[in-house]
């Protein structure tokens, strides 16, 4: 059995925030043939299809380990895969590893404290950007990031589905990607705004010319 955990915070106020990208990927992996396993002892939303378990802990990020431990103790899966955001990776980057340090991620810290760190991790970059780390992870994706998020989640979904049937090293070779630096995203957004402004200016000039021609015709 394989337990796949997507980390995030419960509640509408945290929906679609950067810290919840693990939840988003679990939603992508869910299909109609998964059955919901409702039990308060798991402290999360748990779904099962054959030998695959999908978990979205509902404990809030800092206590994610409580939910993971409860499911791990009950089902005793052979493998655990944890999907989470990573501030230190460029937006859209994908990295795969087993064990290692938490990198300051409180959800990973919580899991490590309760079951150890001998599990596989899918790290999805959200980019550090500027400002306080806590504010960044709890912020929503901007318009430019939102446009790219569909493709990022689609690739990450394929990676997890591949990882289920293959080892972490092969998955890393096939699906690791660098992502985009925040300044590139900012430039793309600026370019789009500039193009939009140029288009609006051209339309304005065109309308002025039409108006001038119309006035000239009336005078004649």
Curated annotation (Swiss-Prot):
It is an enzyme of class 3 (hydrolase). It comes from the Bacteria. It is found in: Cytoplasm. Its EC number is 3.1.1.29. The record marks 85 as: Stabilizes the basic form of H active site to accept a proton. GO terms for molecular function: peptidyl-tRNA hydrolase activity; tRNA binding. GO terms for cellular component: cytoplasm. Belongs to the PTH family. Monomer. This is Peptidyl-tRNA hydrolase. It comes from Campylobacter hominis (strain ATCC BAA-381 / DSM 21671 / CCUG 45161 / LMG 19568 / NCTC 13146 / CH001A).
